[in-house]
Amino acid sequence: IHERLVGSEMCIRDRFMYAFATYDELGVRFILKGAIPAQETLNASTTINPPFELSYWYFAMQIAQIWRERAGEKRNLEWDELIDKLSPLAYNEDGLYLAAENAIDTYKDIRFTSDHMAVLGAVGILPMNKLIREDYMKNTLQWIWDNWNWGKTWGWDYPMTAMNATRLGEPEKAVEALLMNKRTNTYLPNGHNYQDPRLRVYLPGNGGLLTAIALMCAGWDGCEIENPGFPKNGKWNVMWEGLSPMP
């Protein structure tokens, strides 16, 4: 009974995800609009194709098809069409991924660089996929590293950056992101991720830190590098147990 209930709930969710995406006949693609993006400076009603959400849609719909096959059902052809035609991440003339397809001033307007750099979550929290060019994502990471308004970030932004750097083969940045000396990257003796006097407990930071460390140690499916999130400079003796690779 439990398995049937879980399967039913997942089916409802996956059908919603398919129905939520809009087919753009002119562009022969599916787009995401009207969602509340992780980057909170974006307007939900007007935002088109935020990158983290696009990548998550691609990943989640693939998992939905795998679950159908495990349940003995055929793949949903409409879902496969969505997976095949989902919009790639939008970028500018400098090869930098935008905060959203219609956020053309991402790297000029300080509002866009004073919040979660959610674009990094598209590869890091999630695996690399066909919507993303690795060279453009590396460009984006470097620009964010050098220019972001880090004083306006939140606790989970640092582990998200570390996971992105790990998957892009930048272990030095992964470690430095977790150790960055910023107020919102502070952990108190009791373990809480301090943000400010108003917000002394911030669990997304704790969860992000644990997830980032696990990825940096155990890697991900198909990763052949030992401890991929730590520099190979002879200064690290990494020991861990009981962790599984991420997707």
Could you tell me what each predicted segment is?
Residues 22-24, 29, 111-114, 201, ...:
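A general structural signal for short secondary-structure junctions and capping/turn motifs
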Residues 8, 51-222:
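Active-site core of glycosidic bond-cleaving carbohydrate-active enzymes
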Residues 1-14:
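Single conserved hydrophobic/aromatic residue that forms the stacking wall/gate
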Residues 13-67:
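Acidic/histidine-rich catalytic neighborhood
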